[in-house]
From Swiss-Prot:
One of its GO terms (molecular function) is signaling receptor binding. Transmembrane segments: none annotated. Coiled coil: none annotated. The gene is cry18Aa. It comes from Paenibacillus popilliae. Pfam families: Endotoxin_C, Endotoxin_mid, Endotoxin_N. This is Parasporal crystal protein Cry18Aa. Belongs to the delta endotoxin family.
Length: 706
């Protein structure tokens, strides 16, 4: 019997083990490998690698050709290929490296050229990545000018219209002619007004000696009114979901405009009264736009998928809307901070497209699913294993093969395992499975077991960053073959030969999970408590493998139990830590889904401790800010000992409601230094119902804008 199922370093006809795919490029003087699209640039230095599909391979210098062909105009005098360019995703060794706008544009453009089946245009990723970098103090203080150049390149509104066209393709809906014409005209008007305002600011800054600030104040007031008048044109009744990505970009332009006014108040000679007014506007519009976007997404999701639908459709909608709108919403409430590295993100997903026994899930299944794919999210992913069977059947029309993956188990650094998903079969049960197949199918002529056994050589520095998950029809007469393959910088491993890869710039795979086949026996769908290892069972086994992607990159190492240690930026920049990434906890906790929060929150009850392990340079001083929703009698920070006393955010909050969470940021008063290893210990007392949404470590001397 020929065994085509290899879990080690060999390659069989159908199942690939730890073997690198052909076509990956490396430079002899550099470490590691690059993406399939990597090419060498002939006309530049011998040490240069350019990871962009060539337009003219034989040109001595193809930068101009690439720029012209792809419509990439250098924004900050950087070329497409640069000696310090790091290929997308392959290494997680320099999380704090600043990228130029041109580099971000090139990365997301390459991603778009190679991304299967997603309608998302590259510009939405560029804008989000740029904004995340711009939250740091060393970034430009005039964000609006750069965002205008990104969203309206060459003084054209075509890029913004591309966002609308892409959303129309995804949701399979189009604006009526009158609304489409009105939106197009509004985009042109917005572009013209932004150009005029940016020019007026430039003129003022160049000729301000002896000139009254009234001119710039008039320009600011005019621009503010134009934003207020134009934003409703992207909130047309009946088309709210379709217009949401476009609204998110327009709202981001307005909020960065307000932020620029506040940050540059001294340089622009803005009076105190005017500054106070615009600070109030800033806070009010962050809340107004956030609530609109979050409620529009929630209503759209429920309308689209109620009462039940496939998880594939649900996760694709979540991923699309996260990339196109919700990532920006997550940033809006953090714009008040002037020096911050956002370390995590909402999850993106790649889910296998196999259709055998797929079934539909009620919309209420979501909290259960969201809990079991993240219940071990504070650990560092190290691999995945599983077992399955391949059946060979014979019919009068010929033979066909059929794969049946029975279970998978995810493993993490330190030996921790995630929930067993599917069905764990004993030898006796496997024999019984064979008998069942013989009794219920076409003539069974062959039967083999196979194992999935993928382990990362370097899970921290070279995690999985791409997946190829699909199921191919074996022949017209029947059968399906599984293809579930995972790619890191060091290895490619999985079942079958990979097809198109799914990855996202600056995202890494933080968990591998699966759905189970529907058969009426999946009775316990209550959400898992955090860290619970409850099996996710089905006698029919695994249906779709799922890869979970996140921006989490600043991992200094792991604790003895395998949980992650969070690296503070070396230059004293503030940073965030996800509440889902503790090193230990003794308080009853569950995962609470949030839409606009750079990830989900930890829902706490009762009293107990949460521990987080950090690593810093031993010099920079920080204050800890907790983003909280709910009520508690006291939260105590140990070392230094300081407390947040009784609070209730139901009446005292930021004015934003995120899937039921009404939050406020609370700061501990005592600053502290983060040495090479520092444990943050939080004690929660008298908690009735509390969402811990974010931990924000601010530079001790920094003050929020409001």
């Amino acid at each position: 019997m020929n065994n085509n199922f290899n879990g080690g370093n060999n390659t069989g006809n159908n199942f690939t083990g730890n073997t690198l795919s052909n076509g990956i490029c490396t430079k002899k003087n550099m470490k590691g490998t690059l993406s399939r699209t990597a090419i060498f640039s002939d006309g530049i230095s011998d040490d240069l690698i350019c990871c962009l599909d060539p337009i003219y391979n034989n040109n001595d210098n193809n930068n101009d050709a690439i720029c012209d062909e792809l419509g990439l105009t250098p924004i900050d005098n950087n070329t497409i290929c640069s000696t310090d360019f790091t290929p997308i995703n392959v290494m997680r060794t320099d999380p704090f490296r600043k990228k130029s706008t041109q580099e971000l544009t090139r990365e997301w453009t390459e991603w778009k050229e190679n991304s299967p089946s997603l309608f998302t245009p590259a510009i939405v990723g560029v804008v989000t990545s740029f904004l995340l970098q711009s939250l740091k103090k060393q970034a430009t203080s005039f964000l609006l000018k750069t965002l205008t150049d990104l969203l309206f390149p060459n003084n054209s509104s075509l890029t913004m219209e591309e966002i609308l066209r892409a959303t129309e393709q995804y949701v399979q809906e189009r604006l009526d002619t009158d609304t489409a014409n009105r939106v197009s005209q509004e985009l042109v008007g917005l572009k013209n007004n932004l150009t005029t305002f940016n020019d007026q600011v430039e003129d003022f800054l160049q000729n301000r000696v002896g000139i009254s600030p009234l001119a710039i104040i008039d320009s600011i007031n005019t621009m503010q009114q134009l934003f207020v008048n134009r934003l409703p044109q992207f909130q047309v009744s009946g088309y709210q979901v379709l217009l949401l990505p476009l609204f998110a970009q327009a709202a981001t332009l307005h909020l960065t405009f307000l932020r620029d006014v506040i940050i540059n108040a001294d340089e622009w000679n803005i009076p105190t009264a005017q500054l106070n007014t615009y600070t109030r506007y800033f806070k009010e519009y962050i809340a107004e736009y956030s609530n609109y976007a979050l409620s529009t997404y929630d209503d759209g999701f429920r309308t689209r998928f109620y009462p039940r639908n496939t998880l594939e459709d649900m996760l694709q909608f979540k991923t699309f809307m996260t990339l196109n709108a919700l990532d920006l919403v997550s940033i809006w409430s953090l714009l008040k901070y002037v020096n911050l590295y956002v370390s995590t993100s909402a999850n993106l997903y790649n889910i296998g497209d196999n259709k055998v026994n797929e079934g539909a899930y009620p919309i209420s299944y979501g909290p259960f699913f969201n809990s079991y794919i993240q219940t071990k999210s504070n650990y560092v992913l190290s691999g995945v294993s599983g077992i399955g069977a391949r059946f060979t059947y014979s019919t009068v029309l010929g033979r066909y093969l059929h794969d049946d993956l029975k279970n998978i188990i995810t493993t993490y650094v330190g030996g921790t395992q995630g929930p067993n998903i599917g069905v764990q079969l004993s030898t006796t049960e496997l024999d019984e499975l064979k008998k069942q197949q013989q009794a219920t199918r076409d003539s069974l002529v062959d039967f083999q077991f196979f194992t999935l056994n993928c382990m990362l050589p370097n899970p921290i520095t070279a995690p999985y960053f791409a997946t190829s998950l699909y199921e191919s029809r074996y022949s017209s007469i029947g059968g399906y073959l599984r293809k579930d393959v995972f790619k890191s910088e060091d290895s490619t491993c999985g079942l079958g030969n990979p097809g198109a890869w799914t990855s996202y710039p600056d995202y890494y795979i933080t968990n591998i999970s699966a759905t189970v086949q529907i058969n009426g026996e999946n009775t316990d769908t209550t959400p898992l408590y955090f860290k619970e290892n409850r099996p996710i069972t089905s006698t029919r086994g695994v249906n779709k493998v799922i890869a979970v992607y996140n921006r989490k990159a600043n991992i200094a190492g792991t604790n003895q139990n395998g949980t992650m240690i969070h690296q503070a930026p070396p230059d004293g920049t503030g940073f965030t830590v996800s509440p889902l990434h503790p090193s230990a906890n003794t308080i009853t906790s569950y995962i609470k889904e949030n839409y606009g929060n750079s990830g989900d929150s930890l829902h706490l009850k009762g009293q107990g401790y949460l521990h987080y392990m950090l690593s810093g340079n031993g010099q920079d001083r920080y204050r800890l800010v907790l983003r909280l929703s709910g009520a508690a009698n006291q939260i105590k920070l140990q070392s230094p000992t300081t407390s947040i006393y009784a609070f209730d955010t139901s009446t005292n909050n930021e004015g934003i409601t995120d899937n039921g969470s009404k939050f406020k940021d609370f700061a501990f008063s005592t600053p502290f230094v983060i040495p090479e290893q520092k444990e943050i210990v939080l004690y929660f007392e008298g908690v009735g119902s509390l969402d811990l949404m974010n931990l924000i470590f601010l530079p001790a001397d920094d003050t929020p804008l409001y």
